[in-house]
Design a protein with these regions (language model features):
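Short acidic (Asp/Glu) and glycine-rich catalytic loops that position anionic groups and cofactors
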Residues: 26-29, 346-347, 410-416
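Bacterial Sec-dependent N-terminal signal peptides
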Residues: 2-3, 8, 17-46, 53, ...
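Structured, solvent-exposed acidic/aromatic patches
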Residues: 40-42, 75-131, 135-402, 425-432, ...
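C-terminal functional modules
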Residues: 395-514
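Beta-strand acidic-aromatic groove motif in beta-rich domains, primarily in extracellular
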Residues: 59-68, 144-146, 230, 449-452
Length: 514
């Protein structure tokens, strides 16, 4: 065969050369065109993919942030990195960065490029810009300075080593983008993504509320670093109208069948990491709820305990609140003999793959508004009433996740609210702590947003785990590390970011955390 190839290659190539402009180019374009490829992309489909990927990469931090916020832990040092800060696993924090740019950031950028100059698609343009802010906000909040203004421009502008923008500049632009997009959205124009919009199915009014709700979230993020700007943006968001009704909750819907991209990303990752066997024993990575979380729920007689957790008794899941028990994060590498007795996420709620992923809720709006009221930035309602509404909303939203009505009995909600009233006669600090203790439970399983608020407010006042061989000296880390490859492939930009922001270290604070 080798001899035959050698024998006939030259004559064939020579013949082709002699007839270069005749026979050999006949049907060349047709032969080299993939009949299954799309020459003109369908923008609506790319938008759907950007939504899926943005939601998935926001949710897929699994054991890392779940462990860091002391919801879960593992006896396995690798899986338990988030709760143990084990030095050998620190580079795992670069995964969100690595996964974000080629997917959601690139995809939403292509959507914006396709619609921005078309005056008939003003709503599509605004919605895409809002989603781009959502994606970038989740990314910069984890890393600080990141590629932003030049991100996703490799194909369009041949920018293969994008600069890292300062987080202060990123925040300024994101807030400007939200304001411009919310203003541009109009019911007089019918250009939406329709059913390809997996969040609101093209509802312009709801997208506007989502934009102002994100403005409220990001504006409040500035309280430590620039209180005046924080107040200005929070006030503007409230005036624009934020999410206050269940029908307006920003959520991604999923199914139990089909491809994995169609499944709730938090539930799907938790299941695959640990809980597919559903017997309390054969947990692949050794994961269970952490004792800090379960002990808090039990101590506060929180009716969510039986909604979120189960203990397997003789192979059967039990939600009996009296037997729920969290596993200590200090267990050192060996599976405990009583492993089966520890609580783990419930299959019909937290692990429900066709449950919606809640991106911005009524509960979050009310908790943020309660803080704004405490600061004197909002006076139409009291901090106490907003705080109470936030608690009720956080409990009632489990109806959306479970797919049932009355998941938590109204009487138990009333009893809990009465027992945890805001201490209005105490200091602002005491009341703020109460609010963000409720955020810790009420926004679960959105561990990243809880982590963001923990860094900003210091609440809940979690006690770090001083574990042998940890990477932080027994401190809860303040940011994620850039991927190692950035030091090789984008060294100049990486070095500039590190010089400006500080050492690429887990304890270096991002701009708004300083």
């Amino acid at each position: 065969m080798k001899k035959l190839f050698s024998k006939y290659t030259f004559p064939i190539l020579a013949a082709c050369s002699m007839s270069l402009f005749t026979a050999c180019d006949k049907d060349f374009a047709e032969i080299n065109t993939n009949p299954n490829a799309v020459s003109v992309p369908t923008t609506a489909y790319i938008f759907s993919k950007a939504l899926y990927d943005g939601a998935a990469n926001s949710g897929n931090k699994g054991s890392l942030l779940f462990g860091l916020m002391q919801y879960t832990t593992s006896y396995n040092d690798v899986e338990g990195f988030g709760s143990k800060y084990t030095a050998s696993q620190v580079n795992a924090t670069g995964g969100v960065f690595t996964n974000s740019y080629p997917t959601q950031i690139n995809e939403i950028g292509e959507v914006i490029k396709a619609v921005k100059d078309d005056p008939t698609k003003v709503n599509q343009y605004a919605m895409a810009r809002i989603w781009r802010v959502y994606c970038f906000s989740r990314l910069t909040d984890l890393y600080g300075d990141i590629p932003y203004s030049e991100a996703g421009q490799g194909y369009n502008l041949s920018i293969f080593q994008p600069k890292y923008d300062a987080q202060s500049a990123i925040y300024a632009d994101m807030l400007k983008e939200l304001e411009a997009s919310a203003t541009a959205l109009t019911t007089s124009n019918t250009s939406t993504f329709g059913n390809s919009d997996l969040i609101y199915q093209g509802n312009v009014t709801k997208w506007k509320k989502f934009a102002y709700s994100l403005m409220l979230r990001l504006g409040m993020r500035l309280t430590k670093v620039d209180a005046a700007s924080a107040q200005s943006w929070v006030t503007k968001a409230i005036a624009g109208g934020v999410i206050r009704d269940y029908a307006d909750i920003a959520k991604m819907s999923y199914t139990s069948g089909g491809q994995n991209i169609n499944k709730n990303p938090i539930a799907w990752q938790l299941l695959n990491d640990n809980y597919l066997r559903a017997d309390g024993i054969n947990n692949t990575e050794g994961g269970k709820y952490q004792d800090v979380f379960i002990n808090s729920l039990k101590a506060n007689n929180d009716p969510r305990l039986g909604v979120l957790s189960v203990v397997y008794v003789n192979g059967t899941a039990s939600s009996d609140e009296s037997i729920q028990k969290g596993m200590p994060a200090t267990i050192n590498g060996t599976k405990p003999a009583d492993f089966v007795t520890f609580s783990e996420p419930k299959q019909t709620t937290v692990l429900k793959v066709d449950a919606p992923l809640l991106l911005f809720t009524v509960a979050e709006s009310n908790f943020l508004l309660a803080e704004a009221a405490l600061r004197g930035w909002y006076s139409a309602e009291t901090a106490s009433s907003l705080y109470e509404t936030g608690i009720r909303a956080a409990m009632q939203q489990w109806d959306l996740i479970s797919g049932t009505t009355g998941t938590i009995a109204q009487a138990r909600i009333d009893s809990y609210v009465a027992a945890h009233a805001l201490k209005t006669s105490s200091s602002v600090a005491v009341q703020t702590e109460q609010i963000y203790n409720q955020v810790w439970v009420g926004l679960f399983p959105d561990a990243q947003e809880v982590y963001n608020n923990y860094r900003r407010t210091g609440y809940p006042a979690l006690t770090p785990n001083v574990y042998p061989g940890n990477a932080t000296g027994g401190k809860i880390f303040r940011r994620f590390l850039y991927p190692v490859l950035e030091q090789t492939l984008n060294r100049a930009s990486y070095n500039e970011a590190v010089q400006r922001q500080g050492t690429d270290d887990l304890l270096t604070k991002v701009w708004w955390d300083k």
